[in-house]
Curated annotation (Swiss-Prot):
It is found in: Cell inner membrane. Heme chaperone required for the biogenesis of c-type cytochromes. Transiently binds heme delivered by CcmC and transfers the heme to apo-cytochromes in a process facilitated by CcmF and CcmH. It comes from the Bacteria. It comes from Rickettsia conorii (strain ATCC VR-613 / Malish 7). It is a single-pass type II membrane protein. Residues 30-128 are periplasmic. Keywords: Cell inner membrane, Cell membrane, Cytochrome c-type biogenesis, Heme, Iron, Membrane, Metal-binding, Signal-anchor, Transmembrane, Transmembrane helix. NCBIfam families: PRK13254.1-1 (NF009727). The lineage of its organism: Bacteria, Pseudomonadati, Pseudomonadota, Alphaproteobacteria, Rickettsiales. Heme binds at H120, Y124. One of its GO terms (biological process) is cytochrome complex assembly. GO terms for molecular function: heme binding; metal ion binding. Belongs to the CcmE/CycJ family. GO terms for cellular component: plasma membrane. This is Cytochrome c-type biogenesis protein CcmE.
Amino acid sequence: MQKRVRNRLITIIICFCSACLGISIILYNLEKNIVFFLPPSKINEIEQGQELRVGGLVKTDSINKIADDKISFVITDNIKDCEILYQGALPALFRKGQGIIAIGQLSNGKFIARQLLAKHDENYRPPQ
């Protein structure tokens, strides 16, 4: 009977240690890889051509239409500004002072966005 209890205890300890090790590995890898977006003040730390997300507020009077579907604007985190170049349809919530996340690459000091995401506040207002 005592041998049976000891074997069961050893099995439980091994399972617990394996679960702890697995959870530790998962959490370590998630910590390294989860970055929702970087503010403009942090993008100088990223090398040119690397895919990243930059987020901030669209600066007032910075929206310039270059062509029919090309636009340039500046986002800020109130520390540093970043010029964004984007070609494509703008999100419906895009406007000055709005929070934006741009997905793309940094090239010669300008951020070339391939996708724009407009952030909105948490207050839901149904259409009237």
